[in-house]
């Protein structure tokens, strides 16, 4: 395991990642979008055609750039608009539940 990978294992919060990579951030944005930022960051890393493995500095710079890009997505937009998580991808985050389905899920009157 590379020294960078070893250090990344100890990061847990969005703030940890942003501070580690030196990405300036507004705490208000992170408070609302922390999970979205991290998920988008990892999506960008997976989508990248080639990730430099020749030097730690190149790898660090690539990761920093992708994290900054993910953070910027949520400065300019909202989690619902970015649709990072499946709940936002499914029919614009809405699911149809019929009244009949709701009635069927309720206990029968006179019981309980």
Curated annotation (Swiss-Prot):
It comes from the Bacteria. Disulfide bonds: none annotated. Homotrimer; associates with NifD. GO terms for biological process: nitrogen fixation. Belongs to the NifW family. Pfam families: NifW. The gene is nifW. May protect the nitrogenase Fe-Mo protein from oxidative damage. This is Nitrogenase-stabilizing/protective protein NifW. InterPro entries: NifW. Keywords: Nitrogen fixation.
């Amino acid at each position: 395991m590379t020294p960078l990978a070893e250090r990344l294992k100890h990061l847990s919060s969005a703030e940890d990642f942003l501070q580690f990579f030196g990405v300036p951030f507004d705490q208000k944005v992170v408070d609302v979008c922390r999970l979205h930022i991290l998920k988008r960051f990892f999506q960008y890393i997976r989508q990248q055609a080639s990730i430099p493995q020749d030097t730690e500095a190149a790898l660090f710079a690539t990761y920093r750039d992708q994290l900054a890009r993910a953070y910027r997505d949520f400065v300019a937009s909202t989690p619902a608009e970015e649709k990072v998580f499946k709940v936002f991808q499914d029919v614009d985050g809405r699911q149809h539940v019929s009244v009949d389905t709701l009635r069927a899920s309720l206990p029968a009157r006179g019981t309980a």
